Amino acid sequence: MKKMFILVTVLLLVLSLNGCSLMLMQMAAMPAEPTEPTVVTEPTQPEKEWPGFNGTDYKYVYLYEEGRERAWEEDLVYMAANYIDDYGRLSRFPFPVKAPDDSYLSDEFYEPELQQYWIEETNAMIRDIPNMTDTEILYRIQKLVATLEDGHASIYLPRSPLFPIGFVPFFREDGMDVRAVMLPKAQEDALFTKLVAINGVPVEEVVTRLEPYMSYENEAWLMTSIFHCYCYSYATQEDILVITGIQEKAGQSVTYTLESDDGKMFDLELRAESSLDSSKLTGMLPMDSYSQMYKDMDHYYWYEAFPQEDMIYLRINEFTQDNSYTFLNLGNDMLKDVRANGGKVGKMIVDLRDNPGGLTFAGYHEFVNVLKRIDIGQVYVLVDSNTFSNGIIMAATIKREIPESLWVGTPAGQPPNFYGGMSDGDFVMPNCDVIIRMPTSFNKTLPDYEGDTLMPDLLVYPTIEDYKNGVDTVLEAVRALP
């Protein structure tokens, strides 16, 4: 076995800082939790006679006059009326929402059945306020937002206690295995085993229970959101395990059942922690080939030339503009290097794996224009299920501008055409100060592309054996190409 190194700190850092981990932010302020359920008296008037919110035709019940219940009632009606009902709600935004041939906010954009469901579910939530904790209300809002089937539409949930275990989903042509890649040191012998069940609930049922709360557009992003330790990793969050009945009560231990490839079973009884102590955990990633992908986590983007292989490897960790060294600077430096070493390069590898996106205007269009000026034999763009948002836009832009380029890896987390351009600060529920993420623009990078995922031209599935032995399956497959 090749040399291994412990990457617990990186795993935890990614969990807390990754662009996808915004969903784990602590709420700025929340109403106090109830001590005892409040007895609710239904309004004496028929519901149809109650006025609509802000003069709209939609009817939301008004049951509470003061206190926590009134605050949540106002937030729920504000959320429903402004997030889906009031089609003029984004007129104050600096970047109006527009789809290619129609307004994102037109009456035809949402299906009438979906609008009606929002109205009914909002009224149901208002009635249930006294019987729900604040966390339960927020997860119910997230469940409602998830009905939009938009990977960018979601709520900033409160930070949940985490179980000291981390997973990576390994996709195959005929399915998927979820492998444990981070564990307490005392259970190190169970590293790389398959997840079988959580508290006796089989993996398939875990997915079924968590799926209604997930904002996703394809199966790759769904599985990544639930299991991947570089993303949300909901399967290790106590709050949602309690919400979905996988865990009976907060604070109780949960049993993660794992199975080795030779059939040995492991039952790990774990308790969630408000913050994980990396000194008590072990997590291994291969050091040899994988060191290329994770070689420099301190910079947003960087490249390395391999003259002996006639190859340039470009790694983009995330799309955050570094004003001291822009994408344009990066492209120009590569152009100079190529011209100084014969004027052409056989392979250009652009690695967008584990890239959750970032700033919409990070300058990647300028970079691609420079890329087109380099004499390249073949451009390969590496993607996986955690390639999302602007990572998708970059991959699609390269394909559009350099049609002979090839996508390599596993199905990506989004299709090339999707709603994005987040405006996080513009939709805040007034009393609890919780942000709901709202897309503000439609990205149609490849207008003729059909399908719910960016599908690689060359499908290459990483294997657990390669992972354990330090082999980057996808990168090595590209290196082996003529």
Write out the residue ranges for each language-model feature.
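Positively charged n-region of N-terminal signal peptides that target proteins for export
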Residues: 1-4, 351
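Sec-dependent N-terminal signal peptides of Gram-positive bacterial secreted proteins and lipoproteins
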Residues: 4-23
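A short, polar/charged loop/turn motif at coil->beta-strand junctions and beta-hairpin connectors
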Residues: 11, 172, 308, 430-432
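Flexible, low-complexity junctional segments that flank or bridge functional domains
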Residues: 21-347, 378
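Conserved acidic, small-residue-rich alpha-beta core segments centered on
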Residues: 336-349, 353-481
